[in-house]
Curated annotation (Swiss-Prot):
Annotated residues for binding of 3-phosphoshikimate: K20, S21, R25, S154, S155, Q156, S181, D296, K323
InterPro entries: Enolpyruvate_Tfrase_dom (IPR001986), Enolpyruvate_Tfrase_sf (IPR036968), EPSP_synthase (IPR006264), EPSP_synthase_CS (IPR023193), RNA3'P_cycl/enolpyr_Trfase_a/b (IPR013792)
Quaternary context: Monomer.
Subcellular location per the Swiss-Prot or TrEMBL entry: Cytoplasm
EC identifiers of the protein: 2.5.1.19
Xref: HAMAP family: EPSP_synth
Lineage: Archaea, Thermoproteota, Thermoprotei, Sulfolobales, Sulfolobaceae
Primary location group: cytoplasm
Function: Catalyzes the transfer of the enolpyruvyl moiety of phosphoenolpyruvate (PEP) to the 5-hydroxyl of shikimate-3-phosphate (S3P) to produce enolpyruvyl shikimate-3-phosphate and inorganic phosphate.
Annotated metabolic or biological route of this protein: Metabolic intermediate biosynthesis; chorismate biosynthesis
Listed name of the protein: 3-phosphoshikimate 1-carboxyvinyltransferase
Record: residues binding phosphoenolpyruvate: K20, R113, Q156, R327, R371, K395
Gene Ontology biological-process annotations: amino acid biosynthetic process; aromatic amino acid family biosynthetic process; chorismate biosynthetic process
A single GO molecular function term of this UniProt record: 3-phosphoshikimate 1-carboxyvinyltransferase activity
Length: 414
């Protein structure tokens, strides 16, 4: 797919894309209780999660009703995913808790991602692995409900272990610091608490004391990270939008913090009663910010930094190298094509903002990364641009291009 973007001003009201992080967690919750997801958007990552719970005996009706099995067991000995790292990393400890032998594989983007920390951790508790990357054969059953794991590679392992300990009727996780992307661990804990489980997080230790979980019926709430690209598009193009279907921002730093971050950079950005109100200003200020607890915000912050008056620094970026693309290099490459300079330092990137009227009109490839395409599309709204392999947005938000059209973007899709 090729998307041609012409100078446009973004305006209107848009419903936030469903949170794939929350959708995947709710789908995995169906291992324990009935889950009814209304109007579920079938992004590639969500389809991976559905495929995974089916392999464990969950009955799925119309991709909306999820009924837990009477007994959890591995029904399929080979599980083929596409590209959902969240699904993969949460699934591994769940499989280990159920026990048996199973092989997992996925597309090339997941094959190149390391699984070192979860393999190292679970190898100490009765699990055998065929390698440290996909394709991966897992054999055995967890021999302990007290797990110790390093927290520096991915928080998704920790979230998966919380599910695993519910299978094992409770236990504890000791996380060896540093703890990266802590906000996503808190998201998982908040979800279990909401549905009746007792999960406590003290310092670096999580205690799980399962209770019977209540059923869930409803629509998946909006995703601040994905919604932030609509906000970025409005701010870059000189427009203004209202984004609906969003939960109230939490106190801890996470994807929802983008509302405050954009405000600190000089934008009109405010949350009120489930809506995010965004309006462009004539100029934006640079920012220095650590995104280690919410790395998916890197692209949107980089996008606004590109037209800020000065030098911005995004810190805590090391794990961006093991996303769908090497996002550190992707940011450098895409910004460079638009005429924006950047410099990578140890665990940070400097972005040298320019007047937006000086942005180029390049042809950019999405580099097999949905967030790269979304950042590039926002910058292209100023002076135009072309995005190739634009179907990559389907990984998280298959409606993205149609949503931009509804917000008055002038684009053509080939």
């Amino acid at each position: 797919m090729i998307v041609k973007i012409y100078p446009s001003k973004i305006s209107g009201i848009i419903k936030a894309p469903q949170s794939k992080s929350l959708a995947i967690r709710l789908i995995f919750l169906s291992l324990f209780t009935r889950v009814y997801l209304h109007n579920l958007v079938l992004s590639e990552d969500v389809i991976d999660a559905i495929k995974s719970v089916r392999a464990l005996g969950v009955k799925v009706k119309n991709n909306s009703e999820f009924i837990p099995p009477e007994k959890l067991e591995i029904k399929e000995r080979f599980i083929k995913l596409k590209g959902s790292a969240t699904t993969l990393r949460m699934l591994i400890p769940i499989l280990a808790a159920i026990g048996g032998e199973v092989t997992i594989d996925a597309d090339e983007s997941l094959r190149r991602r390391p699984l070192n920390r979860i393999v190292q951790a679970l190898s100490n508790y009765g699990i055998s692995f065929s390698s440290y990357s996909l394709p991966l054969t897992i054999t055995g059953k967890l021999s302990s409900n007290e797990i110790k794991i390093s927290g520096d590679e991915s928080s998704q392992y920790i979230s998966g272990l919380i599910y695993a300990l519910h299978i094992l009727n409770g236990g504890s996780i000791e996380i060896l610091p540093p703890i990266s992307s802590k906000s996503y661990i808190l998201l998982t804990i908040d979800l279990f608490k909401r549905f009746g489980s007792d999960v406590k997080f003290y310092g670096s230790k999580i205690h799980v004391n399962p209770n019977n979980l209540v059923e869930f019926q409803g629509e998946v709430a909006g995703d601040y990270g994905l919604a932030s690209f609509y906000a970025l598009s409005a701010l870059v193009s000189g427009g203004g939008i209202t984004i609906t279907n969003l939960w109230e921002p939490k106190e801890y730093f996470g994807d929802h913090s983008i509302v405050k971050i954009f405000s600190e950079m000089g934008a009109s950005s405010e949350y009120k009663d489930g809506r995010w109100f965004v309006k462009a200003k004539d100029k934006y200020s640079p920012i220095k910010i650590d995104i280690d607890d919410a790395p998916d915000l890197a692209m949107t912050i980089a996008g606004l930094s590109a037209i800020a008056e000065g030098t911005s620094e995004i810190i805590g970026i090391e794990r961006l190298r093991i996303k769908e693309s090497d996002r550190i290099e992707s940011i450098r490459k895409i910004l460079g094509l638009y005429g924006v300079g950047s410099e990578v330092k140890y665990n940070s990137i400097l972005i040298f903002g320019i007047n937006k009227g000086m942005l180029n009109s390049p042809v950019t490839d999405c580099l097999n990364d949905h967030r790269v395409a979304m950042m590039s599309s926002a910058l292209a709204l100023v002076n135009g641009g072309v995005i190739t392999s634009a179907e990559c947005v389907g990984k998280s938000n298959p409606n993205y291009w149609q949503d931009l059209l509804s917000l008055n973007a002038k684009i053509s899709i080939e």
